Each structure stands twice: as C-alpha cells, then as structure tokens.
Amino acid sequence: MAGHHHEHEQERDHEQEHEHDSLQRPTTGSERTRSISFSKLLTRSWKRNASSSNNMSVSSVNLYSDPENSRESDHNNSGSEGQSSRFSKLKSMFQSGNSSKNASAHNSSQSSLEGDSASSSSKLRYVKPMTSVANASPASPPLSPTIPETDVLQTPKMVHIDQHEHEREHSNCGSPIMLSSSSFSPTVARTGTGRRRSPSTPIMPSQNSNNSSSTSAIRPNNYRHHSGSQGFSSNNPFRERAGTVRSSNPYFAYQGLPTHAMSSHDLDEGFQPYANGSGIHFLSTPTSKTNSLTNTKNLSNLSLNEIKENEEVQEFNNEDFFFHDIPKDLSLKDTLNGSPSRGSSKSPTITQTFPSIIVGFDNEYEEDNNNDKHDEKEEQQTTTDNKTRNLSPTKQNGKATHPRIKIPLRRAASEPNGLQLASATSPTSSSARKTSGSSNINDKIPGQSVPPPNSFFPQEPSPKISDFPEPRRSRRLRTKSFSNKFQDIMVGPQSFEKIRLLGQGDVGKVFLVREKKTNRVYALKVLSKDEMIKRNKIKRVLTEQEILATSNHPFIVTLYHSFQSEDYLYLCMEYCMGGEFFRALQTRKTKCICEDDARFYASEVTAALEYLHLLGFIYRDLKPENILLHQSGHIMLSDFDLSIQAKDSKVPVVKGSAQSTLVDTKICSDGFRTNSFVGTEEYIAPEVIRGNGHTAAVDWWTLGILIYEMLFGFTPFKGDNTNETFTNILKNEVSFPNNNEISRTCKDLIKKLLTKNESKRLGCKMGAADVKKHPFFKKVQWSLLRNQEPPLIPVLSEDGYDFAKLSSNKKRQTSQDSHKHLDEQEKNMFEERVEYDDEVSEDDPFHDFNSMSLMEQDNNSMIYGNTNSYGKIAYTPNSNRSRSNSHRTFFKR
C-alpha cells in the first residue's frame, strides 16, 4: 500500500507542477480583474443538480498570516517534505514500469466511477483518491499566502462515493471537531500535526498530502466547511455537495459559495439562529482585527458572472453593507415566501428569452433541468453575487427595505427571489402582484409569483403612447404624403404683423412678417384666389405647396405654415435675409463674380436640383431671381410654381464602387415629358421652344445659363427681343468673351450643359451624377457643402440696398386712389379668418390646398429686432474663405 500510495503521489507531483504554472494569482477586492465564472467550470450534469437559494455565502479569508505560526509551520514541514520527495524520486527509478501500470489501472477505475459526464467534459482534471483524515502524511508549507492550490471538480456521480468515504473517515477519527456557537473564530483541524490555526492565518493546502480538499476558508459558525478532509460531521447530502464545490475551486474560498451551488438546507441552517432567537448576528464578521476580502470587496465592480466590468452601482445608504440590527424576534425563514427552502430544491423553469433588468435585490435561477441545449447560453447569464440576499425589510418611502442596507441597482439573470423577501411584509407589493397583467412572465411559470420591480420601489410611471395626444389632422391632410410632418393649422392671418413688403408678382405679394406669439420673422406669401382662377394657376400653387411641404433640404426654403381664407392663400416660409441672388449680382460693378465663387454657388444649386429630381420634381424655372441667399450666405431655392412632378416616378439607382458612389437621378423622371411652355425666355431650353416635350434635362440647361451669367454678367443667347432670343437659342452655339481668366474645365462644363440635343447633354444619362463627376467640380466636397464658407454674407444695414424700392418701380400707381386701394387690400389680408380643411367644400377649386402647421419648427428662425433695417441689405465678403485667385475677388468684379 505504501508503494502504491507513493506512486500516485509521484504522478500528482508532476500534475501539480504543471497546474501551478497555469494558476492565476487571486487578486484582492480592490483590483479590477476578471475572475473565473463558476458556471463555466461546472459540467451540464452538475449544473442540472445544482439548486438555487437565497442564502448568502460569506468567505472570510485573511491574507495576512500569523508570523509565529507560519515560521513554526515551515520548520515542522521542511524536513518531512524533503524526505518524502527524495524517497519518491528514488522509488520512481526502480519501479517506473510498475508505476505506469498502476497509474493506468487507477485511471481506468476512476473513469468508470465518474461515468460519461467526466469523460465528456474537458474541464475536469484528475480526482484525488479518497483517504482517511487519520492519514499522517506530512503537509508542506503553502506556496503563497494568496495562492491556494486548486482542487478538481467532482461530478455528481462521485457525490455518493464522497459521502461514503466521508462517513467512514468520521467513524475512524472519533468525534469531529465542532465550532463554538458563541465565537466566530473557527478552529480547523490540521492534519498530521494536530495544530489549530489562528483566525488571522489563512488555511492553505498541502502540496504533497492526499487530502481530498485543498482549500479551506475561515467561516462563521453558520457556514461550516463541509469538506471530508476537515473532519466536519454531516448527514445531509446537500451539504456534502456544497462542501465539494467549495473545495473544488480556489475562487470560492475567498468569494464564498454561489447560491445556485448551495442547497435549501444550507439556507435553513443559516437562518436557524434567528429562528431560535439566539441573537447571533447572521452576517457578523469573524472576531479578527483584519478585514476579510468579502468586506473590502468593491461592490461597484460586480456584474454578471462576477466579471468586474466597472458596472456602476447606485447605493442608497453610506453605512456598512451588512446589517447588524435585525430584531431577534424576526424569523427570516418565515419571511421567505418564495424561497426554495420552503419546498423542493429544484430550480424553477424560466421561459424568458432575455434576462430581465431588475432594480433592487437579485438572485439567480437556473435553466430548465431537461433543457440541455441552453446550458451554455445560461452559463453566461448566471451571476455569483450573493451580497444582497436575505435582507430584513423595513418601510422606506412606503416600501419594504432595510434601513441600513445599501441597495444596488444592477442586472439579474432572472426575476429575483429577493424581491419576494421584500414584498413579503409590504402590503403594497402584494396588491401590486395581484393586479399584475397576464403578460407577466410569472403567468407562464407555475408556482412562481414574483412582483414587478415597481411594486416595492417607487418609480415614476413610464409614459405611454396614449399619454401623448395625437396631433390633429384633417381627413384631407392624412391622405397626403407629407402628413407625418404637419398637423392642423395652429395660426391664422391675425397671428402675424406686417413689417414691410418684400416683393410682388402677378397673382400675389410677399411680406416680411413677425409672428406675435414667438416674435420670429417669416416671409409670408399671399396669393389672390381670384387672380389665380383668372390666370389658371390653381395647379401651380398646389404643386408649390406639395414641393415645399415634402422637401427637407438645407438648400430649399422651409415651409412652416400654409392656410387659406375666403379670398387668399397663405404660404409662411423661412425668411432669407439676403434676398434674391440676382440682386446680389446687380450690386457688383461688372454684375459678375469670379470662377471660384461661381463654383461654390453652382455646386449648391446642383445639390438642390439633385434632391428635387430624387423626389420626382422638375424645377424648370432656375434663374437668379428664384435663388435666395440665406443669412448664413448659402443659397435657397424658392418659387416652385412652374415645377412639375413626373408621373410614375421610379426608384433611383445607386451605381459605382465604394469609393465613388453615384445616384442615378434621371430614372426618377425617365420617360416623362411635358409640353408646357414655361420659364424665363433667356433660360428656356431648345426642346421647350420646339414644343416636342421636355424632361428633367431642362434643369441642366438652365444650370449652364446660370453659370455663364455668374461669370460674365449676361446670358449667352440674349437678343433684342423675344423672337431673336429664341432664334439664338435654337441655332447659335455658345461663345465666350475674350477672357483668358476662365479655365478650360469651366468652359467645357458650360458647353456640355448647353448642348442643344438633350440626349447628348451632360446629365441626360445619370442626372446629377454626371454633372458632379465633371472636372470643374473635382475639388468640391459634396457632403460638406453646408459647412463650407460662402463667398459673401448678407448684413442688414441702413446703407444697404432697399429691394422694396427697386421692386416698387414695377408698380403702376396712376393715382392716389389706387394707392389707398392697395393699402386697404393689404390690411384685409391680415384680417381674414382661416378656413379649415373640413370647412372647404369638395366643389371648391382650392379644396386640395391644406391648412397645416409644421410639427417641429426650426428654432434658427430670425428673432425680430426693432433696430434692424429689414429690407436694406449690404453684402460683405467672408474673411474666413480662402481664395486661390485673390486678384479677382468678389468686389473687384
């Protein structure tokens, strides 16, 4: 037997030397490192037999050993260790062959005992043979005060063998060593020496001993170490299982046993002092001056599976986490309504797909016992935090909590049993449990009744969709594609105050107005219904409203309100302080700008046209008069009365590689042609004059005319009259003045845009993508156009140009009576009553014009100031804009 014993000792020495290199040094509670998850070390068969509990396992291991005991221990063990190791090496030299045979025979017998679960798991290591406590093999000193030697996990099939050996050991040893119930300084038998360790010295394993347990932790009386090698008597198989778990992993020697590895019987005995009224504190620390690791552990690092991810913890009290003032007459065992200790230790079946987010106490449940395929998934969700279990509830804010407990807010893998503890003495929580809806997970779990978190923690009720009133929309508004952006009209003509006239046309006027309620400035376009009926422009205003309401682009004006009265239509739009871009060109001496500035404005116009084409709209009226300057200096397209929407527009196609993605905008209006003769005569495309119909390519023709006018100050085909202008457009080729300051790429772009054959014109194939690929726009950052510095900034100034006076020259004021009539007419415009959509009859020609307000208004609208000279604009150069061609700045031209 002695030879056989030393043969196994030799093999275990080699194995321990190999395992020692792979062991990780346990960290203190303040270090933030990842620790080993207990659920990852358990096999499936062990996991199915583990039971969940509300019990708390406290491990009080002291890292600072007693110097006297450690020196004496080293002295006693040094000689025996050397003698044993020399004898083992000498023995192996002569009996190497016999040792191999015995080792293989022992491994085969051990494998037969462990069964399939041990053979299928790669995480199980060699299990030490069970020996008697009376074994007098010498114990070696510990490797380090903080590095306990890990033992191996035993499968559930080995539990009954462990119990049999354990009972035989106790029968041979006589009376076991028991802990005093009056002291929390445990005394643990030390094999081979009969010496007792002091509470300040951590119990470390013996490297060369055959004891089945390698780690022992100092625990209170209620938490005895159930390892067979320590000589504790136990007739409870569940307690023996918990002892095997404690002895199998060094992690739990410091952190305590997880609740899902403990049985309900441990919980019952743990609560016994309180049930008997003995007055012994359940979670009192050992009578040692040195704090244990569990007391100095940083609670802010706790997370799922004890992985310290710096998860924040909200603490409601600043006192010690453990409570010490629990009433003696309170039986925590009686308050655990939902504890597994009341019934079977079998884990409940959780059918919830994802872990619940629980506020307050936490506990862990295991997966269904028969559902093996979800074991590995549930291992990631199993938690090992036991510090918030078994709390004595008191009233706090009308809910059940303990006055000296720091309640963390953290995740839990399932609905906690600790919540039942808090709700056991709270009438509000019990009533909330009764009124819980059928959608609760408890309805799907037989025998489980877990209240929602808000039943015992006061929380603000979550807002429901029904709490927010749905915006009012008329039946006609709900049928429009832009109905999600607007609601029924919130303003009227009386809500605005006229500041001055900005411009006028054949069917209406544009006023600068101030909203009385918000003091914001807008541009209000007022159209006469009578004039529109006479000129047959009803469809035009409906198209303009649809484009303005549908568009959401930085280079297209924003529509805030649109409504109608008995005589007028109103379009309340964003006020562009810079006025018409045509006016800005007219303020220049040569009526033109340099090539770099023209490239900037042309690129923004191209981006706006691309957006309109994506929506299926053809602008058809691009000219400097319809381009407005925002207060930031960027352009804004307006006046969409001549625009038209292509019928049966197709979805745009994205082409190109990842580095150069292009959007085919021509397909949005592909196949659509219109014969309308619209546009300004100098900007009309040749196909419009011919009357054969036109497509979206007319917008690229007008872009070429616009770039030409920005560079040279006049249009390329202008004649003395309309007929001569049309003749030049149809027959003459574009020519450039003798000006070498215009680059070749710029001239090439203009020529390709002004190609008379629309099928060969630039942009006829892929729309805006063809234009943006031209070398003229090579350095343009299309995605950052809105953030680029514009060439000039409009500023309100008394010395600026008064555009209202310029436009007044077009008025026909033949007499003073007509002037009074105009004033009276403008006054009536702001006194009309709004007609809502439901009030307009179906036979009304303007019944499709919606009275609506934008739901989310832009706060960047200008605020009215009395000192501002609205209408008088001065243009200042932007000093932040870099110019490569400085000798031809905006003002020099």
Curated annotation (Swiss-Prot):
UniProt enzyme class: transferase
Compositional bias ranges of the Basic residues kind: 884-893
GO molecular function: ATP binding; protein kinase activity; protein serine kinase activity; protein serine/threonine kinase activity
Catalytic residues, chain numbering: D621 (proton acceptor)
Subcellular localization(s) per the UniProt record: Cytoplasm; Cell membrane
Ranges annotated as biased composition (Polar residues): 24-42, 76-87, 228-237, 334-355, 381-399
All copies of domain AGC-kinase C-terminal, residue ranges: 778-861
Alphabetized InterPro entries for the sequence: AGC-kinase_C (IPR000961), Kinase-like_dom_sf (IPR011009), Prot_kinase_dom (IPR000719), Ser/Thr_kinase_AS (IPR008271)
PTM-bearing positions, type Phosphoserine: S140, S144, S171, S175, S185, S300, S414, S462
Primary location recorded for the protein, binned into one broad class: cytoplasm
GO biological process, one term: phospholipid translocation
Notes on activation and inhibition: Down-regulated by YKP1 phosphorylation. This effect is counteracted in the presence of mannosyl-inositolphosphorylceramide (MIPC).
Low complexity: compositionally biased ranges: 49-62, 96-122, 206-216, 422-439
Function noted in UniProt: Flippase activator that phosphorylates DNF1 and DNF2 and which is involved in the generation of phospholipid asymmetry in membranes by the inward translocation of phospholipids and in the retrieval pathway from early endosomes to the trans-Golgi network (TGN). Also phosphorylates the N-terminal half of YPK1. Involved in pheromone-response.
Protein name (record): Flippase kinase 1
Organism: Saccharomyces cerevisiae (strain ATCC 204508 / S288c)
